[in-house]
Amino acid sequence: MVDYSVWDHIEVSDDEDETHPNIDTASLFRWRHQARVERMEQFQKEKEELDRGCRECKRKVAECQRKLKELEVAEGEGGKAELERLQAEAQQLRKEERSWEQKLEEMRKKEKSMPWNVDTLSKDGFSKSMVNTKPEQAEEESEEVREQKHKTFVEKYEKQIKHFGMLRRWDDSQKYLSDNVHLVCEETANYLVIWCIDLEVEEKCALMEQVAHQTIVMQFILELAKSLKVDPRACFRQFFTKIKTADRQYMEGFNDELEAFKDRVRGRAKLRIEKAMKEYEEEERKKRLGPGGLDPVEVYESLPEELQKCFDAKDVQMLQDAISKMDPTDAKYHMQRCIDSGLWVPNSKSSEAKDGEEAGTGDPLLEATSKSGDEKDVSV
């Protein structure tokens, strides 16, 4: 049966207690609380003194009992008086011990009968709070460290990675990874991705699709390890068990990811080819640049049609006639561009003898040599 008598008298101030109009209610509550705290502190101090006195008395009783046992073992004639003294002392100490225990019991009863107040109604259930924090992640490796790690791994295991990339059956892949668990890592997946792009650039599409399948296998294993928060080497068998017994929806997800990956590979390969073509065209353009840094092809295409015909015909006289009919400013502008691009080299008679045989060899552009001794250079 529950004893509810402890609730009969509770010393708790109520905000609705009526006080004299001339008395500040807040101050009255504060004074009451202060007096109550002082009484509690005094009571606690007396209780601690009783505890210390009782413990000290018990220690003396135990010490006296030990001496009595030692004296009884000795059983000497001269120790009889000492034995009687210790027995009397032990009797007195036991009497004091009972007195201390009686005082402690009275103190406990007094404490139990004390009315509850705002400070004793409840006690702390916890002295501190524990908050789970996310474990500190290892510092991310720098780009240089990752590249060096990848390079070292590939140099050591490239042959094994390529062998895995050529497998197709689930059982074969699982067995090969079981025999070479070091391949179950991010470096293998990265190498397979790059290999797929290289194969697509080389137009080896069928082989690319084969390697792409194994790339997605490795990526699925890594994703499974990340979701389970375990090392990939500890869960790759779980992936193969899951994929071999997977339902239709799971297999469709795998195949969808595979097709999306192949599309991304084709896109990356296309961009790489376009970039290579642009770089090649830029190199060729730089090789064509004339002494003034202009591209002869671009300059030729920007010339008026009548000047283009002159260069197509490689006729100097025709070129001179066309220039004489043009506005002097336009003629100077176009001929200067021809000189800067190398389409036209003025004052080239000195090299006529050496280069005469090479002139007119099929080049659609006018070179810096004359064909005959009576041809004149154009100076603009």
Swiss-Prot record:
Residues found modified as N-acetylmethionine: M1
The keyword Phosphoprotein is assigned to this record: yes
Keyword Zinc-finger assigned: no
PTM: Constitutively sumoylated by UBE2I.
GO molecular function: ATP binding; heat shock protein binding; protein kinase binding; protein-folding chaperone binding; unfolded protein binding
Modification Phosphothreonine, positions: T120
UniProt keyword annotations, A-Z: Acetylation, ATP-binding, Cytoplasm, Nucleotide-binding, Phosphoprotein, Ubl conjugation
Annotated region (Disordered), positions in chain: 124-145, 344-380
Residues the record lists as N-acetylvaline modifications: V2
Subunit structure: Probably forms a complex composed of chaperones HSP90 and HSP70, co-chaperones STIP1/HOP, CDC37, PPP5C, PTGES3/p23, TSC1 and client protein TSC2. Probably forms a complex composed of chaperones HSP90 and HSP70, co-chaperones CDC37, PPP5C, TSC1 and client protein TSC2, CDK4, AKT, RAF1 and NR3C1; this complex does not contain co-chaperones STIP1/HOP and PTGES3/p23. Forms a complex with Hsp90/HSP90AB1 and CDK6. Interacts with HSP90AA1. Interacts with AR, CDK4, CDK6 and EIF2AK1. Interacts with RB1. Interacts with KSR1. Interacts with FLCN, FNIP1 and FNIP2.
Function according to Swiss-Prot or TrEMBL: Co-chaperone that binds to numerous kinases and promotes their interaction with the Hsp90 complex, resulting in stabilization and promotion of their activity. Inhibits HSP90AA1 ATPase activity.
Designated name of the protein: Hsp90 co-chaperone Cdc37
Lineage summary: Eukaryota, Metazoa, Chordata, Craniata, Vertebrata
